Curated annotation (Swiss-Prot):
GO terms for cellular component: cytoplasm; endolysosome; endosome membrane; lysosomal membrane; phagolysosome membrane; plasma membrane. The gene is Slc48a1. Heme transporter that regulates intracellular heme availability through the endosomal or lysosomal compartment. In macrophages of the reticuloendothelial system, is the heme transporter for heme-iron recycling. Essential for macrophage iron homeostasis, transports heme from the phagolysosome to the cytoplasm during erythrophagocytosis (EP). It is found in: Endosome membrane; Lysosome membrane; Cytoplasmic vesicle, Phagosome membrane. The keyword Membrane applies. GO terms for molecular function: heme binding; heme transmembrane transporter activity. Keywords: Cytoplasmic vesicle, Endosome, Lysosome, Membrane, Transmembrane, Transmembrane helix, Transport. The keyword 4Fe-4S does not apply. It catalyses: heme b(in) = heme b(out). This is Heme transporter HRG1. A motif (Di-leucine motif) lies at residues 142-143.
Amino acid sequence: MAPTRLQLGVRAAYSGFSSLAGFSIFFVWTVVYRQPGTAAMGGLAGVLALWVLVTHVMYMQDYWRTWLRGLRGFFFVGALFSAVSFSAFCTFLTLAITQHQSFKDPNSYYLSCVWSFISFKWAFLLSLYAHRYRADFADISILSDF
């Protein structure tokens, strides 16, 4: 079922806001706190949110109708980064527990864990929306083959 224009607008606005948040986390945790784990995962979350935004904008402009292979690529990229984010989450959680770090410390691996989960969320959403939009246009492409 195709989303309404309002749903697409809300999804695009949320993706845009989240990409700005991810990029700001990247810069703050790189420059101020010098915590590369949190900076990397925040930056990855920002890039993935931007990618989801591009997916929504291309759907609104009806660009995917002629390029369904691109949606398949977006799906696999989302699946790849889901695996990367999940493994980073497990790694940061293990490091935080074994090093007995505090929850309140901005340099702890627990914060990297949070941003790994947020990156996982955006990677999952990228795969989900690519799959849904591809299914939406697959019906149309079958009809256009005749």
